[in-house]
Amino acid sequence: MSNNTANSSTEVVQDMCPYPYVDLHSHLQFEDFDGDQESIIAEMKEKNVITINIGTTLETSVAGLDLALRYSDTCYATLGLHPVYADESGLDELEKFSDTLKKTVQDEKSRTHMVGIGECGMDFFRVKKDDSKEDGILETGDNVENAEVKHFPIQEKVFERQIQLAQEYNLPLMIHVRDSYQKTLSILSKYFNTGEVKYRGNAHFFVGSMEEAQAFLDLGFSISFTGVITFVPVYEELVRFVPLERMFAETDSPYVSPKPYRGKKNTPVHVIEIYKKIAEIKGVSLSVVRETLYKNACRYWLKGRNIDNFDSYSPVR
């Protein structure tokens, strides 16, 4: 059999695979998609893609949930406060956020599609590093001209409150961890014990070390990879390291388009390219990745979906 024939047969099998592609983390409610949402969601339905609209402020959280309720077969949502918005006004928003979350959980219709809390965490990306300090991170009181340093305690307070709310309502966390792996793990370790079986949430847009990945796994978190893995080869070893059963794919759209869409606005449909890359790196078929990641999503995030819908299907391995 020629290579062309073999590839053609594989593509037919892949097209027959019933498991939806799951984009675990997108921002389809952002204004970047104004005017395009309907056409993008139509393409998602055509290509069997579902996504979670991740909240970053109270406003985008509510908008993401509204979108999920309008397109309930395609979209879900989280409510969350992103650390980059955790300044003095963020403390006021935190109180309003807590009230909104409580009302959402109590509303029978909303709670079926509000599936987690986040994105929340710590973000040190815009902070100058200090090599003289053991952890390399500047803190409040350090002698540096950087306005964001003073917001670290607020970031931490907003993050910890969302962890507490996740525990109170038994919801998974969508963790934002940018240049802050050790600090984020330190905070999470105050609330979760290493080696516990219970699922706690997902470390989104993971680009840390294997040791940091293992630390998240040990605390009960999964790890998601973006389109970065399609054009930065150094992360292939990390993808090989993380078990498929503890992994997700995400677009973080409208940001960070994968190959071959670099330079264009990202959409949840492009998660297909991330799935293909994971299959290539793992050395398994695309259908195996689709099955495993969908079942991961149903177990941990999309609990209203029937995980057994496709049990009669046997994927090509």
Language-model features, listed with the residues they occupy:
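Mid-domain alpha/beta scaffold segments of enzyme catalytic cores
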Residues: M1-R317
